[in-house]
């Protein structure tokens, strides 16, 4: 479904990700793990064509359903983002206008993807919150971002990202700004998306415990390169990579969830 083939990402002449490859099948969850600055977020931004500041894929290719993404026109990207590939951020509150109601932001998001009335879009947004099992969907739509907890804002962000049932969901540090109990809830919700809708997910995280609990495959990154990779069992139990073992030793608890 997604094939990243030996990509190098550069800003100017400086490579920040070098010779990165991974494959993701339909319904799989993969995690990119590593310290800040290791290139994790750069990889998923390259997949979505959202590299900032003149960043570019200088080598390699990215294939989605067998088609290269690197030759997409702006119109092709607009059709793809949100419908086929969607993204949630570290703090979904950052993508919500603080002086507008949740519902107004949801309506605007929906109407960028289809030509329907504001009333129809409001109903669709409310129905999506209900589909994601958020209690009091209408009250949430009427609320401002500051009136919701960080965990609830994140769940709203997930609901928005899933509105058009994308095949691929990219999650950039979706739990790092949350307390451990809420982290566990968000992790479970993303796993339910995979189980219910067959959504493929790439999770960027510095927490190997989160990755180990929810992932089929794990890629450990360091200094813009792949340091280690393999399925969950290999990384947890059989990896002999010193950096991977250091990350495992630093794993905190996750709201009572065990990763081994």
What are these regions (language model features)?
Residues 163-167:
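A short, proline-enriched helix->beta-strand linker immediately N-terminal to the Walker B motif
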Residues 229-230, 238:
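ABC ATPase "signature
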Residues 184-197:
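Helical segment within the ABC ATPase nucleotide-binding domain
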Residues 33-35:
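The feature captures the beta-strand-to-loop junction immediately N-terminal to the Walker
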Residues 211-213:
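A short, surface-exposed alpha-helical micro-motif characterized by mixed small hydrophobic
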Residues 56-68:
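Conserved ABC transporter NBD signature motif
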């Amino acid at each position: 479904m997604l094939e990243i083939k030996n990509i190098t990402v550069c800003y100017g002449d400086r490579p920040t990700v070098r010779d990165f490859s991974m494959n993701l099948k339909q319904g799989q969850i993969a995690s990119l793990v590593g310290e800040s600055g290791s290139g994790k977020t750069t990889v998923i931004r390259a997949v979505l064509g959202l590299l900032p500041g003149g960043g570019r894929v200088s080598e390699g290719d990215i294939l989605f359903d067998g088609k290269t993404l690197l030759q997409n026109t702006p119109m092709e990207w607009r059709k793809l983002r949100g419908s086929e590939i969607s993204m949630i951020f570290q703090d979904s509150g950052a993508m919500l206008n603080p002086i507008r109601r949740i519902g107004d932001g949801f309506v605007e998001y929906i109407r960028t993807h289809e030509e329907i009335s504001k009333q129809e879009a409001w109903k669709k947004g409310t129905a999506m919150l209900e589909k994601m099992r958020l209690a009091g969907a209408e009250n949430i739509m009427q609320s401002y971002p500051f009136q919701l907890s960080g965990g609830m804002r994140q769940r709203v962000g997930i609901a928005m990202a899933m509105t058009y049932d994308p095949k691929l969901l990219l999650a950039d540090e979706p739990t790092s700004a949350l307390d451990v109990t809420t982290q566990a809830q968000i992790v479970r919700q993303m796993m339910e998306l995979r189980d219910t809708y067959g959504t493929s997910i790439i999770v960027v995280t510095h927490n190997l415990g989160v990755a180990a609990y929810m992932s089929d495959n794990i890629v450990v990154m360091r200094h813009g390169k792949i340091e280690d990779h393999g399925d969950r069992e290999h990384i947890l139990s059989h990896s002999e990579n010193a950096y991977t073992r250091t990350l495992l030793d630093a794993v905190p608890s996750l709201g009572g969830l065990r990763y081994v």
